């Protein structure tokens, strides 16, 4: 679905001094807040609760309200709201047609019209790959702007307004067909997998949405041809690729070696999992097309420590390691469990919080198959993310051999205490508030051991 233009980025930059962001605590909205703040705007916002992200933004002099009654409409303020935010709860609901009230996709559409945009999309891996690409550019003294929905060690929240402000590296989200409303000059596609089918209705529609954004990209397109759906696409556009085939511009020899034009290059990285090596190959390819040598990219990658909540190591106590991950799709859970099991000496315990009733219903059997790869899995109640419950859809439906349902996250630390031993690891995984659980488990085990 295309989004109609309200005003251009030049008008935004020249007409407003104040920006107010609704849902500012989310990773996607906080990156816009940081970008706009660095661009010279007075930025404020609203969120339901305090978090690591809101605390970080407040430390950067961004004022945040936690009471809806604090929000009042001002014609001289630009409002940007998350698609997950319910505007009807505010007095802005009657102003949604106003030029100064934009959804996140509408804002990004305007922003991409006046920049050279390097977009990164794909069902899986787009946040990590966008962050890696931004790091490669910055490590090589290319101070470009970027917006992505994650937190990194190299620059915190994933938003930056660079001195080379005509180039924007952007995570291009396929949800709600957002990426097809953007103007993209260079595009990297990591993969296509079944997701967001509550919106697209079927997989074919999702594939066609990816095909459209590829065909409409102005310049370079880089595809992962190890992904079957990308490989099957019939395209009129010239593409560059990375894959395990020597027909690609970047060939993945194994998990630690890539090749280009007959020369092999060693990858040195702290990131866990073969899927990250694939993302690295894609980032190297599109950086190369933008004038950064493979050697210079690899040097940057060596100093990249990843994105928060991507197989993130939180700490250990009594030989028990705790990890946290954002994965909320069966494929993401599968690859993360597989990667960690290689590194864990003992047993791997996984605590999963399903994200949205529609996704849980859609992928129930696949979630089970992924979770059964752990030595033991625990599932807690579904994180709704603004959705209403669907009758008959519950985390309890995921119970199986070695998959235990525990309704409340608060009961998980004490349950695990009776299970885990030195050498074991615990992975908390999901896109909701389960990210709060890992530190609680670590603290509980530390106090009780």
Regions flagged by a language model, labelled:
Residues 4, 8-17, 21, 35-41, ...:
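Phosphate-binding loop of NTP-binding sites
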Residues 44-45, 145, 378:
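Conserved beta-strand positions in the Rossmann-like core of class I SAM-dependent methyltransferases
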Residues 63-75, 408-416:
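Short acidic low-complexity segments
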Residues 367-422:
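C-terminal helical cap/extension that packs against the catalytic core
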């Amino acid at each position: 679905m295309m989004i109609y233009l309200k005003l251009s980025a030049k008008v935004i930059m020249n007409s407003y001094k104040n920006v107010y962001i609704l849902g500012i605590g989310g990773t996607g909205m906080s990156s816009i807040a940081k970008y706009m703040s660095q661009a010279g705007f007075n930025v404020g916002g609203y969120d339901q609760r305090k978090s690591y992200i809101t605390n970080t933004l407040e430390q950067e002099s961004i004022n945040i309200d936690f009471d809806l009654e604090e929000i009042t409409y001002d014609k001289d303020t630009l409002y940007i709201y998350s698609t997950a935010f319910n505007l009807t709860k505010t007095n802005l609901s009657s102003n949604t047609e106003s030029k100064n009230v934009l959804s996140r996709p509408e804002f990004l559409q305007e922003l991409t019209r006046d920049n050279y945009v390097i977009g990164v999309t794909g069902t899986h891996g787009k946040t990590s790959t966008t962050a890696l690409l931004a790091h490669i550019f910055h490590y090589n003294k290319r101070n470009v702007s970027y917006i992505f929905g994650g937190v990194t060690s190299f620059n915190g929240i994933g938003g930056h307004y660079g001195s080379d402000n005509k180039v924007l590296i952007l995570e291009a989200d396929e949800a709600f067909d957002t990426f097809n409303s953007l103007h993209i000059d260079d595009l990297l596609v990591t993969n296509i997998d079944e997701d967001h089918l509550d919106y697209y209705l079927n997989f074919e529609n999702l594939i066609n949405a990816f095909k459209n954004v590829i065909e409409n990209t102005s310049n370079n397109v880089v595809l992962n041809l190890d992904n079957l759906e990308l490989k099957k696409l019939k395209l009129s556009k010239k593409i560059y690729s990375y894959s395990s085939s020597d027909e690609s511009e970047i060939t993945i020899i194994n998990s630690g070696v890539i090749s280009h034009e007959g020369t092999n290059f060693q990858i040195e990285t702290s990131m866990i999992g073969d899927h990250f090596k694939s993302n690295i190959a894609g980032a190297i390819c599109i950086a190369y097309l933008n004038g950064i040598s493979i050697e210079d990219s690899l040097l940057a990658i060596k100093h990249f420590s990843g994105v928060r909540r991507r197989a993130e190591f939180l700490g250990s106590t009594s030989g028990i390691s705790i990890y946290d991950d954002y994965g909320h799709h069966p494929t993401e859970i599968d690859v993360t469990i597989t990667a960690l099991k290689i590194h864990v000496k003992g047993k791997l315990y996984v605590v999963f919080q399903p994200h949205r009733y529609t996704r849980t219903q859609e992928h129930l059997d696949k979630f089970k198959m992924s979770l059964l790869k752990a030595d033991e899995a625990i599932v807690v109640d579904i994180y709704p993310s603004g959705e209403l419950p669907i009758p008959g859809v519950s985390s309890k439906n995921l119970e199986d051999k070695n998959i235990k349902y525990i309704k409340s996250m608060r009961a998980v630390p004490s349950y695990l205490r009776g299970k885990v031993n030195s050498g074991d690891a615990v992975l908390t995984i999901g896109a909701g508030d389960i990210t709060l659980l890992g530190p609680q488990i670590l603290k509980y085990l530390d106090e009780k051991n």
